[in-house]
Amino acid sequence: MTSQPTSSLQGSCSICFEDLKQNDKISAIVCGHIYHHGCISQWIATKRQCPSCRRTVPKNGFVEKLFFDVQRMGGEAEKPPEIDYREEHYKLSTSLKVEQEKLGTLNTENKNLKDTVKSLEKKIIREKDKYRQEIPKLQATINHLTISSEETAYLKRELQESKNRLKTCEFYKILTVHSSEADKQLGEYLKKNGNLDTEKFFQLMKSTNKDLTDKRREAAKEIEQLKMEVQSLKRAAQEDAAIKKTLKKTVLDLRERANVDTPINNKRLRDVLETETPPPAKRKSMGFDESSQMIDPDGELSFFKQNENRTPVTSVPSTSKAVLPFNFDDDEDDEYFKTPKIAEKKKKLPEAMAPVSEDSFDFDIAVPQSIINRIPAKTTAQPAKKYPKIPNLSAKTSSKPTEAPKTENVLKIKSKSQEIAQKPQKSTRISSFFSRTTSSTSNLTEYVILD
């Protein structure tokens, strides 16, 4: 038995390009073209035109399903195959769920994208507003910077011109110093454009620097000479100080020698020491400390020390003229009156010691009136005094000039009651300015200490 060939349709779907089969669901549109039902349904949902001829398809302008009655070659009609609808339903349901899930995902993404687009649109609007507000500010800044740049360029030009003028002024000053006709010579150092000729200016500066260098050298030489003069003056001052120190030491030595056991061999000195002097009329020392205020080992005070404890020199009243210091500038025996003050032999002064107010000598000498006027006035009458004679002394001077004189053989004085009652007197005698002491234990030799 021979097999008979099955009948089939000869055509294809223009959308999916698959063959059209008899058992497929085939649909047709108003223009006459046929497609798979699923393909044309999706197409019409997207765009209502025919995929082949681009004819507009109305809402109900297509046939959903076509049926074809194709007979076999033997003339018998072909039986349609049996279809399992349950399996088809399951497949379609599964495909529908998958597509729904995809649709939900796409909807979510679409929503998110829409939100993003909205936020971006708002941001764009904000940025536009911001830039619209910034544009005038930036434009004003640009204008300000443009004006500032123009002013800066102008100031730079002015600065350059000022520098050129300053150079010209300095050059003119230098030229004025070196030349009396600066205005005439100024044209020689300037170019045609008015700028300074640097080469000629440098030459002038070199000559100026040379002159200043010469002046500096001369000043340095003068400074060296002045330094040498200062050094020589310093050396001379040091030498003068040394000489002064030596002379002072010599004077002190002479004063110490005058305080040593020295016999009175000078006639003029003896004549001067002959008369008595009131106690308050003590003369001032000749630039040094007083040396007559000495204390002997036995505690007896000298004549002037006793008077000083009793009545200070500043309290002596002056009757006619001010008491002036006694001056021996014209005397050749001045060194005898300059005696140092020996402080190491001082002791505590007795409070009740009465001053000695008389010195007795056996010869007399006239005293000038100027010296008499310096002596305080006589307050009480003086009793008659007996003057002891001073014998001729032939003893040699002591070998120890710095030894203090002894007061064992001092001249006899009156009793203490008479000394207290005695007042200062004005006399024509100068011997009261000095205290007489002895320098040895012998009763035959007498010595005098000069103040």
UniProtKB/Swiss-Prot annotation:
EC id: 2.3.2.27
Gene Ontology BP terms: DNA repair; protein ubiquitination; replication fork processing
Localization, UniProt: Nucleus; Chromosome
SUPFAM superfamilies on file: RING/U-box
Coiled-coil parts of chain: 96-130, 209-243
GO molecular function: ubiquitin protein ligase activity; zinc ion binding
Ranges for region Disordered: 270-297, 389-442
Claim: Zinc is one of the keywords in the record: yes
Main EC class the enzyme belongs to: transferase
Principal cellular location given in the protein's record: nucleus
Zn finger intervals (RING-type): 13-54
Ranges of biased composition (kind: Low complexity): 427-442
Keywords annotated in UniProt: Chromosome, Coiled coil, DNA damage, DNA repair, Metal-binding, Nucleus, Transferase, Ubl conjugation pathway, Zinc, Zinc-finger
Catalytic activity: S-ubiquitinyl-[E2 ubiquitin-conjugating enzyme]-L-cysteine + [acceptor protein]-L-lysine = [E2 ubiquitin-conjugating enzyme]-L-cysteine + N(6)-ubiquitinyl-[acceptor protein]-L-lysine
Classification via CDD domains: RING-H2_PA-TM-RING
GO cellular component, one term: site of DNA damage
Domain of life (superkingdom): Eukaryota
Pathway assigned in UniProt: Protein modification; protein ubiquitination
Similarity comment: Belongs to the TRAIP family.
Stated role: E3 ubiquitin ligase that acts as a key regulator of DNA repair in response to replication stress. Acts by mediating ubiquitination of the CMG helicase complex, promoting the unloading of the CMG helicase complex by the p97 ATPase (cdc-48.1 or cdc-48.2).
Identification of the protein by name: E3 ubiquitin-protein ligase trul-1
Species, as recorded: Caenorhabditis elegans
